Structure formats: structure tokens, C-alpha cells
Amino acid sequence: SGYGPHAWRIMFFIGVLPALFALWLRTGVPESQKWEQSNEKRKSARERKKSGAAMSEEDHALTRFTFADLFADPEIRKRTIIVFLMSLTTTLAWWGISTWVPPFIAAAAGKAGLPPQTWASYAGMSYNLGAICGYIGLGFLADRFGRKPIVMIFFAASLLLTFALYRWTTDLHMLLVVAALNGFFTLGQYSWMSVWLPELCPTRMRATGMAFTFNAPRFIAFMGPLFAGMLIAQFGGFSGMAVAFSFIYILGFSVVPLLPETKGKPLPG
């Protein structure tokens, strides 16, 4: 790099600029009407609790700590556990598959007498270009065909395309194409969380439910880098490890049917 040892700092500085732009955008985005109504109910319930007045079941729900509320109601508890398993599938499998795309293709390029670092860059760009398309595409597809079938297709396709990338494709240029397709499904599938999760949680706990579902699996996935060397040796290299992790998609695929289809339905109150 022409920027020397400070190149990584420049990269992170550039990466934070969109976050600052989003922070500015946030100042012009109003709170939703449903949240405003729910917040007013919460304030009233807290006032009744402080004054010792009689409280309804809804009042008790509104004054509970929202994280505990996720597990208080049987139906919400069921949904929380299911979406946690789906999020764990997405996060853990994505780490175990995507991390090794650049070194895997770089190794293939090296065997063909081509510069490995250059092809590792091509691999990363191809994978992430596909992922961007997947981020955008999942939302349109879910609105057209429904949340359940599209999420199940993304899980199933991720499993198959991991085999296609790491086991079935040998041509170097085709590896870049398959890497893009793999990125479309394995990383692009993260969009299901922003599409489906808001439609599964009541307003009073929606943000808490989304934050828990999105972030809790990371407390498991973060251990991956700590054991990466051991896992690569255990599974016989990059490809063996990636294929082994792809079977996690069976878990996500299996639990999706247990959730309600929410396409075209209003957000819970």
C-alpha cells in the first residue's frame, strides 16, 4: 500500500464517515406513531404504579424490564427463541464460510501461477458485491413472495452454494462468480432481521427484541477467531471448515416454519 503502516487507520476513518452521515439523517427522522402511543401508555402505567393505583395486566407488561418481557409471554418467548436460533445460524455460518473465501481463492490462484494477493482481493470484492445485491434483493423478494419462503430459500441456497464454492468449482474465474452468488445468500441474508423482526415483536419491546436477536449470537461467534487455527486443522483446511459450518443452515431452515407469516400484516401494537 502507498499509505504505509497507516493504511488500516485510513480505512477505518473512511468506514466511519457513513455512520456520521446516518447520525445526521437520524435528526430528521420522526418517531413512529405506534411508538409514541406505546410510550404514552408506558408513562401512564408507571405513574399508576408509583401512586399505588390498581394496575391491569397490560400495565404490568408495560412497566416490566423490556428484556424480561421478551420471555414473559409464551408466544413472544417462543418467537424470541426461534429468531435467536435463526440469527445464530446466519451469524455463525457466515463467519465460518466467508472468512475463508479470499485465502481459499488465493491458494487456488497460487497453484495456477497467478498472484495470490491480487486474487484474494478479487475474491473479497466479488463476495461483497454479491452480498450488497443480497441485502437489497431479500427485501424485495420477501415483499413479493413472503417472509417464510424467502428466508428458507436463502438458508438452503447458502448451504448448496458453499458446497459449490469450496467443493464443486475448479475454474478460477468461475470461483469468483460462485463467490458472488455465495455472498448474495450467506451475507445478504442478514436483511431478514430488519425485514421480519419488527413484525414479530410488540411495539413496547421491538427495539429490545431486535437488539437481542441481532447481537446475542455474536457472543458465541466471537469465539471463532480464537479457535480458528485449531478448527482449520481439525476440518482439514479452509474448504473442510467452511463446508462443516454450512450444515448449520439446516438448523435455521428447520425452525423458520414455526414462525408466523407476516407479509402484508400491520405491525403489532
Over which residues does each language-model region extend?
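Interfacial helix-cap and linker-helix signal at transmembrane-aqueous boundaries
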Residues: 1-3, 105-106, 141-142, 228-236
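Central mid-sequence intracellular linker of multi-pass
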Residues: 2-71, 250-269
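Helix-loop junctions at membrane interfaces in 12-TM secondary transporters
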Residues: 2-5, 167-178
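Extracytoplasmic gate region of multi-pass secondary transporters
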Residues: 74-133
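A late C-terminal transmembrane helix in Major Facilitator Superfamily
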Residues: 129, 203-235
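Cytoplasmic membrane-interface "Motif A"-like loop-to-helix N-cap segments
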Residues: 144-155
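C-terminal ends and interior cores of transmembrane alpha-helices
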Residues: 156-170
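Intracellular juxtamembrane helix-capping segments at the cytosolic ends
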Residues: 188-201
